[in-house]
Amino acid sequence: MGEPAFTSFPSPPVLGKLKRNMMPWALQKKREIHMAKAHRRRAARSALPMRLTSCIFRRPVTRIRSHPDNQVRRRKGDEHLEKPQQLCAYRRLQALQPCSSQGEGSSPLHLESVLSILAPGTAGESLDRAGAERVRSPLEPTPGRFPAVAGGPTPGMGCQLPPPLSGQLVTPADIRRQARRVKKARERLAKALQADRLARQAEMLTCR
């Protein structure tokens, strides 16, 4: 008997490297857009973020690194910039100055009307008291006011603000009495806090 004959099958043809992309055009376009967005995000993360504060000039945030050459990165033009003034606050302060609509200084009558608005019933009394004190000797000190400086009249002498509501003087005995009251109040507060702390500790022990 002879040896069995081996049947040889033809090998498939070699196709070689494909030259055409098998992805659909729409999917390929979406992939390119996604890769471009990812590249832009990586580029944005590599740059220093900008500090957005109340300052009108943006400055990059300083990243802390462990090397001696760490410096605040900024533009060269920022070196000569002056600190911006708060114009709104400056205008508010200017509006508080006692002056008339023409820009002139306000008279005692204008100030009297302002004081009557702020504290009704006290402006007239203060001005009457100022007029009565003007009759006295200029060297005689009056309670609640500083004596006039020698060499000329004090500006705004007739525009005295109303005195405080309590006209009595504070004596050292009043100060010592108030200090004793404060000390007693603090002692009562310390005792109350200690009792509360002990009660909380006892409650925690009973809950366990």
UniProtKB/Swiss-Prot annotation:
GO terms classed as biological process: DNA methylation-dependent constitutive heterochromatin formation; negative regulation of transcription by RNA polymerase II
Cellular component GO terms, alphabetical: nucleus
Pfam families in the record: MBD_C, MBDa
InterPro entries to which the protein is assigned, alphabetical: MBD2/MBD3_p55-bd, MeCpG-bd_2/3_C_dom
Entry's Gene Ontology molecular function annotations: methyl-CpG binding
Keywords linked to the UniProt accession: Repressor, Transcription, Transcription regulation
Family: Belongs to the MBD3L family.
Note: The MBD3L proteins are encoded by strongly repeated regions of the 19p13 chromosome. The exact number of functional copies is unclear, and some of them may represent pseudogenes.
Listed name of the protein: Methyl-CpG-binding domain protein 3-like 3
